């Protein structure tokens, strides 16, 4: 199949985003709905018939294409974006002028976590920077934060480059002894955390310095790790919430509109939870399709991994109810151990096929400072 794939046309990705933007600007729900079929067609063509030319790039790009498709389902089809408002917005969205709607749509499209909107889940996000903080104070602080994430990412990447379990022809992550499995699981998490945090912090510095956005629009992308004493709090409060809007709105649609289940019931809560984790699994599984292609059914583990997370949360919830558990200091310490052990057990089975396919080729930066200091070679390491 790979010999018949065409180069991924960047123009189609732009066209998909243009359709989403037009839909967000438009006052007409009918017009928005008419935009979804071309978004679906363009997305399916890219996913099924094209490639970036590098499987370790395809896995990321295919997940992004799927995310845009689901965002299209949210904006164009299952919800009315006119119901959304910015914080402090008094004029109904459909009554804004064309120029105001264009700016409003730009804010919506660039805010996957709904930062600055009334539907932002502020109770689960880190605090916003203070609105009265001077711009250059924010820029200096975020610049130091960005440097910190760069150092962490560079060190983690050097360790990954030197570790056989992350290489295409390396040792299986599931076959190493448990102490090393603990270490490699922590390294993988540290890479994702530092990589996304670095990019996010760097973007905040640039965009605030240019006056494109305000400093209080940049709450940290990851939450406080002290909340990771349950699987539920890890996914809901610690890990990034970039997909929160699209997984929750589709969960709402399936649970409360399609199945019409009453809110607050055991069945409705779990249908919503499993739907949300299923959607997250789909995003990552389609990414795996871009990497594995004909071997996707044998190697993909995303759906299994994310549905296991929903199951773990269900078990936590019911055990907590039965034994009336409260987050005492002792139970929190035990909870941190439980959370880490859970990921040591479940994560390697999902990630190992990806590492054998070259997933770590994309990790870090082309030139590594720590690798150069360690090996005396200032060279490309990815």
Curated annotation (Swiss-Prot):
Pathway: Secondary metabolite biosynthesis
Residue ranges of coiled coil: none
Record-annotated membrane-spanning stretches: 5-25, 33-53, 59-79, 146-166, 192-212, 335-355
Role played: Acetyltransferase; part of the gene cluster that mediates the biosynthesis of erinacines, cyathane-xylosides that show unique biological activities, including leishmanicidal activity, stimulating activity for nerve growth-factor synthesis, and agonistic activity toward the kappa opioid receptor. Within the pathway, eriL converts cyathatriol into 11-O-acetyl-cyathatriol. EriL is also able to acetylate cyathin A3 to produce 11-O-acetylcyathin A3.
GO molecular function: O-acyltransferase activity
One of the protein's GO biological processes: lipid metabolic process
Superkingdom in the source lineage: Eukaryota
Keywords (A to Z) from UniProt: Acyltransferase, Membrane, Transferase, Transmembrane, Transmembrane helix
Subcellular location: Membrane
Gene expressing this chain: eriL
Swiss-Prot/TrEMBL catalytic activity: cyathatriol + acetyl-CoA = 11-O-acetylcyathatriol + CoA; cyathin A3 + acetyl-CoA = 11-O-acetylcyathin A3 + CoA
Topological relation to the membrane, as annotated: Multi-pass membrane protein
Matching Pfam families: MBOAT_2
Record-given protein name: Acetyltransferase eriL
Entry GO terms, CC: membrane
EC number of the protein: 2.3.1.-
Family: Belongs to the wax synthase family.
């Amino acid at each position: 199949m790979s010999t018949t794939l065409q180069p991924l046309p960047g123009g189609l990705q732009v066209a998909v985003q243009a359709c989403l933007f037009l839909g967000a600007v438009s006052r007409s729900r009918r017009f928005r709905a008419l935009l979804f079929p071309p978004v679906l067609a363009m997305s399916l063509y890219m996913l099924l018939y094209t490639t970036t030319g590098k499987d370790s790039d395809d896995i990321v790009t295919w997940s992004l294409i799927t995310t845009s498709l689901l965002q299209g389902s949210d904006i164009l089809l299952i919800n009315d974006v006119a119901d959304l408002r910015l914080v402090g917005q008094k004029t109904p969205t459909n009554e804004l002028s064309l120029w105001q709607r264009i700016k409003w749509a730009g804010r919506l499209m660039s805010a996957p976590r709904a930062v600055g909107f009334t539907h932002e889940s502020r109770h689960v996000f880190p605090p916003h920077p203070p609105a009265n903080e001077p711009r250059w104070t924010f820029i200096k602080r975020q610049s130091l934060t960005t440097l910190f994430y760069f150092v962490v990412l560079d060190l983690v990447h050097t360790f990954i480059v030197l570790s056989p379990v992350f290489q295409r022809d390396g040792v299986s992550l599931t076959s190493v002894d448990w102490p090393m499995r603990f270490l490699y699981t922590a390294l993988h998490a540290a890479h994702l955390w530092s990589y996304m945090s670095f990019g996010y912090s760097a973007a905040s510095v640039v965009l605030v310095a240019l006056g494109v956005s305000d400093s209080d629009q940049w709450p940290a992308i990851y939450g406080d790790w002290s909340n990771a004493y349950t699987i539920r709090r890890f996914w809901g409060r610690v890990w990034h919430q970039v997909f929160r809007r699209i997984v929750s709105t589709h969960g709402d649609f399936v649970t409360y509109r399609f199945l019409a289940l009453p809110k607050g019931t055991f069945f409705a809560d779990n249908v919503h939870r499993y739907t949300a984790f299923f959607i997250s699994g789909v995003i990552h599984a389609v990414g795996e399709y871009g990497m594995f292609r004909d071997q996707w059914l044998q190697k993909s583990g995303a759906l299994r991994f994310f549905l296991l997370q929903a199951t773990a949360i269900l078990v936590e919830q019911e055990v907590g109810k039965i034994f009336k558990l409260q987050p005492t200091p002792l139970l929190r310490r035990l909870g941190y151990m439980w959370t880490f052990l859970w990921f040591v057990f479940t994560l390697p089975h999902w990630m190992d096929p990806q590492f054998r396919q070259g997933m770590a080729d994309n990790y870090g930066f082309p030139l590594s400072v720590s690798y150069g200091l360690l090996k005396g070679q200032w060279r490309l390491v990815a």
